[in-house]
A protein has these predicted regions:
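Extended effector regions of multi-domain proteins
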Residues: 1, 17, 55-148, 152-288, ...
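Short, non-transmembrane alpha-helical segments in secretory-pathway proteins
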Residues: 1-38
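A short hydrophobic beta-strand element
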Residues: 41-54, 264-268
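Short, structured motif recognition centered on aromatic/hydrophobic residues
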Residues: 2-10, 46-52, 72
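Short, charged low-complexity intrinsically disordered segments located at boundaries
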Residues: 34-48, 360-364
């Protein structure tokens, strides 16, 4: 509806004509929520800005040819076009960048098929939204804002189910861009809170999105008018071989023992404009849990005049720039290690001082620091200290007499590159730390 309304707005049509575009129906417009910069015109309004591209034909790659400097401003509450901003004409990039199979003349022939078969079926059991697999138990959920939600994760230890996680889900994500020109500084969308990552779900296809013996979960959503919408095959669950779990060779007696690793994969994929986000929860036979976000799709593109080398981005095609940007994903995990009495410790590896007990200076050890309250957060990663965090239950001990716990091991990460005074640093303050800890109340 918005796209049709904008395409045929007289002021927008006039701006297209200035750029040599005489068919508005070939223009695609993605509405992006506008950041609040405290301007008078923004107060009390829900605004969006239209990002525009031009197709050569209806099935063309929509993101290859950006229409630079033309931005309709939308008042979502009034369902009106508030303003058409025109920063001046920049030539439309020449290349189509078509990737669809129908545009390709031939394909590679040097790859052989991989067949994944489980003649006896998968090892998991599903009843409704309850899943059992290799001593794991959990419930699978979904919301329009968060997307995939994992509930009540537990592990069967002998004859009892031991709780680990009460609830885990993406709580927010934001993608701030780093180009100050025209209105690109307003590109800082909260894809969860403002857009609703769960509403952007794909219906997954066997053999492409998911491979093997697949179990799908459907989800119940609603459309823009509040009508019920049942989406099929939104959540994919399957098993994967994951290489060697454990191995040891005893050369003295000539024996080798090897155990294969298998993991349970629960995933969903969302399309937000030009980008696809894949969200994957992995559960392993050794008790490990991983969370991974896979980013694919198409880079968000803007146009520059011929011969211009952009400072705040990379040329990806003639006259097409992909602006510098960062993707931040905030995952809320309500831990429940053997119950509710959990504490969080920061664990750093430290060098022991030279002393009578460390005369050669080779000793190092770990230092555990209790995170006592919210004021102790946020915490940041420190690869030079091999920093991790552990969630412990001091009232429950393992067979060695130590408090039971789970280690939180960070992966590759950075901090924001924006100036401290940038608006996004206030709007998305969670970016300033890698771990935030708060007691449930």
């Amino acid at each position: 509806e918005w796209e049709h309304k904008i395409r045929h707005d007289p002021q927008f049509v006039e701006a297209l004509s200035k750029r040599g575009i005489d068919n508005p129906d070939l223009v695609i417009i993605d509405p992006w929520p506008i950041s609040n910069f405290g301007e008078e015109s923004e107060k009390g309004k829900r605004l969006a800005i239209g990002r525009c591209w031009l197709r050569r034909e209806e099935t063309d790659n929509g993101y290859a040819r950006p229409i630079e400097g033309l931005s309709p401003i939308l008042d979502l509450n009034k369902s009106e076009i508030m303003e058409i901003q025109d920063f001046g004409v920049v030539p439309i990039p020449p290349n189509d960048g078509n990737y669809a199979a129908r545009y390709q003349s031939d394909f590679r022939t040097d790859i052989k098929p991989i067949e994944i078969t489980q003649p006896e079926g998968p090892s998991f059991e599903v009843q409704g939204n309850h899943v059992k697999w290799q001593k794991w138990q959990m419930r699978i959920g979904y919301t329009p804002r968060e997307g995939l939600v994992i509930h009540t994760v537990g592990y069967e230890d002998q004859d009892r189910l031991r709780p680990i996680i009460y609830r885990a889900a993406l709580s927010e994500m934001v993608v701030p861009y780093g180009d100050p020109t025209n209105d690109h500084y307003k590109k800082q969308v909260f894809d969860s809170g403002e857009v609703g990552i769960g509403k952007c779900a794909n219906s997954l296809e066997l053999g492409c999105d998911c491979l093997g013996e697949i179990y799908y979960f459907d989800v119940a959503l609603h459309d823009i008018r509040g009508n019920a919408l049942n989406m099929q095959n939104v959540i994919c669950m399957h098993e994967e071989d994951f290489g060697i779990l454990w191995k040891h060779s005893d050369n003295r007696i000539g024996e080798t023992e090897t155990r294969r690793s298998r993991r349970l994969v629960v995933s969903t994929i969302a399309t937000v404009g030009n980008y696809e986000y894949g969200f994957f929860w992995y559960f392993y036979q050794d008790g490990n849990i991983d969370y991974e976000v896979k980013l694919t799709g198409i880079l968000n593109s803007a146009a520059v005049p011929p011969g211009v080398t952009p400072k705040n981005g990379t040329l990806v095609a003639p006259q097409v720039v992909a602006h510098n940007h960062q993707h931040y994903f905030n995952v809320r995990v309500d831990m429940m290690i053997d119950g509710l009495k959990n504490s969080v410790y920061e664990v750093d590896t430290v060098t022991d001082p030279i002393s009578e007990n460390n005369m050669h200076g080779n000793a190092f050890s770990t230092k555990k620091t209790l995170i006592k309250n919210e004021r102790d957060a946020p915490r940041t990663i420190d690869p030079f200290a091999a920093r991790t965090w552990t969630v412990n239950n001091q009232s429950s001990t393992n067979y060695m007499g130590e408090p039971v716990g789970y280690k939180i091991a960070p992966g590759e990460n950075v901090l924001p590159f924006h100036h401290d005074n940038a608006v996004i640093m206030k709007r998305a303050a969670f970016m300033t730390g890698h771990l935030w800890v708060t007691a449930y109340n």
